[in-house]
């Protein structure tokens, strides 16, 4: 908790090469790199703003020196040279994943370069990436939807890391330690904590040996013990109010289930009875009938905890040019929820929702990228692949 946002920072700098990729002269670059690491620790420990600024200037000078003997975008260029596309990465609540597409005949070259990426990475241009991440944070603060989402998360998962953005806390973004980023990499980027997902025109039996000789070089060691967090003990009603966004809304949070739980799919169906893409849910009907402006219902199932989120926006009265009260909108939503709980749902709607969910799954599985993400999530959530795919 002292160094939040490390997983996301790491996602950014994992594109900057290694001691072999991205360097013109590692013998010259390495001592400069070590000085940069030490200077970030020194700056983090310094409380005097003037001295901090002076250290920052030293880091800038060292970064310029390192840039003269390095090519920080060489990894991306290598991927592009073999026909690779869509090179990117993302960090979520439970994982960071790196992805791209490439021609099947380049599989051997891809395995070599991609595995090399995770061997002795060098976090070049850390200074500029810090600015990029902080700009990402600032854009989020200017977005009322993002501020509202962050507020809801902070209450929905209070006491758990899910309660905060993957970007990290602002005080940590302002006071980074490159040494902690390296420690995070060494702790968590191990063979037992990673998975390789290949989807497309590949024969697993033919390339298994090549995978073993490339990705098999990753260090095999135990990861630190994962901290566990008790789930919220929700009793009765707890209400929070904040002036966020451009118009009023009510968001009701209920304890859900983690990903892979036997009740995950039943809960998704139950929430789809309130809101779905075909607009046949109880909240959808309220919106169509002019009782509310709009409504939504969804299950957020993470690896450790889950939440049911039901949101409604009060009806806007065009004649009086004002919204109805949040209390009125909440009352209508609770009535719709109770109807579902009482089983006041026609069978055809339930069957239509299940059919639509199956159709959407089949459509998603038509794209290799989506199929890879589904397999990845199954691994992260320790789900049975047979059940996930069927």
Describe every region a protein language model picked out:
Residues 87, 182-187, 236-242, 299:
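Short, surface-exposed beta-strand/loop micro-motifs that present aromatic residues
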Residues 123, 130-131, 145, 149-150, ...:
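Non-catalytic, conformational "gating/processing" segments within enzyme and secreted inhibitor domains
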Residues 117, 121-125, 138-141, 158-166, ...:
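An aromatic/glycine/proline-enriched structural segment found at the starts
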Residues 204-208, 262, 319-321:
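Extracytoplasmic/secreted cell-surface and envelope-processing proteins
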Residues 133, 262-270, 287:
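PPIase-associated folding chaperone regions across multiple families
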Residues 93-97, 127-139:
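Short, glycine/charge-rich beta-strand/loop segments that flank catalytic centers
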Residues 173-177:
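Short, charged, amphipathic alpha-helices and their helix-cap/turn boundaries
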């Amino acid at each position: 908790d002292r160094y939040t946002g490390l997983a996301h920072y790491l996602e950014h700098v994992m594109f900057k090469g290694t001691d072999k990729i991205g360097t013109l002269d590692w013998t010259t670059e390495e001592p400069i790199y070590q000085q940069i690491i030490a200077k970030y620790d020194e700056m983090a420990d310094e409380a005097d703003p003037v001295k901090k600024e002076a250290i920052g200037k030293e880091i800038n000078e060292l970064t310029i020196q390192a840039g003269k003997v390095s090519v920080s975008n060489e990894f991306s260029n290598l991927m592009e040279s073999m026909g690779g596309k869509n090179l990117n990465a993302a960090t979520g609540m439970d994982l960071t994943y790196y992805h791209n597409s490439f021609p099947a005949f380049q599989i051997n070259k891809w395995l070599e370069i991609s595995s090399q990426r995770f061997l002795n990475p060098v976090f070049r241009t850390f200074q500029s990436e810090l600015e990029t991440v902080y700009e990402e944070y600032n854009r989020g603060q200017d977005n009322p939807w993002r501020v509202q989402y962050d507020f809801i998360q902070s209450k929905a998962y209070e006491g758990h890391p899910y309660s905060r953005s993957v970007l990290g806390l602002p005080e940590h973004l302002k006071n980074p330690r490159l040494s902690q980023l390296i420690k995070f990499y060494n702790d968590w980027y191990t063979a037992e904590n990673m998975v390789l997902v290949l989807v497309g025109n590949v024969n697993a039996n033919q390339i298994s040996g090549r995978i073993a000789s490339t990705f098999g070089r990753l260090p095999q060691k135990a990861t630190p013990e994962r901290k566990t967090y008790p789930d919220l003990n929700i009793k009765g009603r707890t209400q929070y109010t904040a002036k966020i966004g451009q118009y009023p809304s009510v968001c009701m949070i209920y304890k859900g289930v983690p990903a892979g739980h036997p009740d995950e799919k039943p809960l998704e169906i139950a929430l789809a009875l309130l809101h779905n893409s075909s607009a046949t849910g109880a909240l959808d009907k309220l919106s169509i009938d002019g009782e509310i402006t709009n409504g939504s219902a969804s299950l957020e199932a993470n690896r450790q905890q889950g939440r049911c989120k039901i949101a409604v926006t009060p009806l806007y009265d065009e004649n009086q040019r004002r919204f109805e009260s949040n209390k009125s909108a909440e009352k209508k939503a609770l009535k719709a929820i109770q109807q579902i709980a009482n089983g006041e749902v026609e069978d055809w709607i339930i069957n239509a929702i299940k059919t639509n969910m199956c159709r959407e799954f089949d459509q998603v599985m038509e794209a290799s990228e989506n199929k890879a993400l589904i397999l990845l999530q199954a691994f992260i959530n320790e789900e049975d692949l047979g059940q996930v795919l069927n």
